[in-house]
């Protein structure tokens, strides 16, 4: 948690927002960033700028790493915070629960956003419309504490835009 706060503060000073931090084998520290306005995409130059800053800041803060990787969230970006679940309302996601609900942990459906409670409160409930085993549309109601991981389902159009 301390690492996340320090890295988030460094990114904020550079004008970026932290999406997630992952630690992998071999000392890899993967930091995923985005622009706070969500309009401008992350470029290689953005990743280079952040990498340069963090390669100096992390040793000063005694945050261990052997290799540092900076990246954008990508097409299948993780959906982590309450604000993300609200922001991506209406989008298709793959959602995995920590504990099975109705004999299922994995769901693919459309986010319904905040259903009840305050956005950043622990009792906030979000919704997901998905196709049930019988083919009928069902709704899953969940809190962030129940979610193991969620990612956007990439939408790729190989035919190009239609006018």
Swiss-Prot record:
Subcellular location: Cytoplasm
InterPro entries, per database record: Ribosome_maturation_RimP (IPR003728), RimP_C (IPR028998), RimP_C_sf (IPR036847), RimP_N (IPR028989), RimP_N_sf (IPR035956)
Membrane-crossing segments per the record: none
Coiled-coil annotated residue ranges, if any: none
Biological processes, Gene Ontology terms: ribosomal small subunit assembly; translation
Pfam name, any one: DUF150_C
UniProt keyword annotations, A-Z: Cytoplasm, Ribosome biogenesis
Main location: cytoplasm
GO cellular component: cytosol
Gene3D superfamilies: RimP-like superfamily, N-terminal
CDD domains (UniProt xref): YlxS_C (cd01734)
Family statement drawn from the similarity comment of this UniProt entry: Belongs to the RimP family.
Role summary: Required for maturation of 30S ribosomal subunits.
UniProt name for this protein: Ribosome maturation factor RimP
Organism: Polynucleobacter asymbioticus (strain DSM 18221 / CIP 109841 / QLW-P1DMWA-1)
């Amino acid at each position: 948690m301390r690492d996340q706060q320090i890295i988030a503060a460094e990114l904020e000073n550079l004008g970026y927002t932290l999406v997630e931090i992952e630690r992998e084998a071999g000392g890899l520290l993967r930091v995923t960033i985005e622009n706070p306005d969500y309009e401008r995409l992350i470029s290689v130059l953005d990743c280079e700028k952040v990498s340069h800053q963090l390669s100096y800041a992390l040793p000063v803060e005694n945050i261990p790493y052997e290799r540092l990787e900076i990246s954008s969230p990508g097409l299948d970006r993780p959906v982590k915070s309450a604000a993300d679940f609200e922001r991506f309302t209406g989008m298709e996601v793959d959602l995995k629960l920590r504990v099975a609900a109705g004999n299922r942990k994995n769901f693919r459906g459309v986010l319904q956003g905040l259903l009840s409670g305050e956005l950043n409160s622990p009792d906030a409930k979000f919704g997901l419309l998905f196709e049930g085993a019988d083919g009928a549309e069902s709704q899953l109601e969940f809190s962030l504490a129940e979610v193991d991981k969620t990612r956007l389902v990439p939408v790729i159009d190989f035919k190009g835009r239609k006018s």
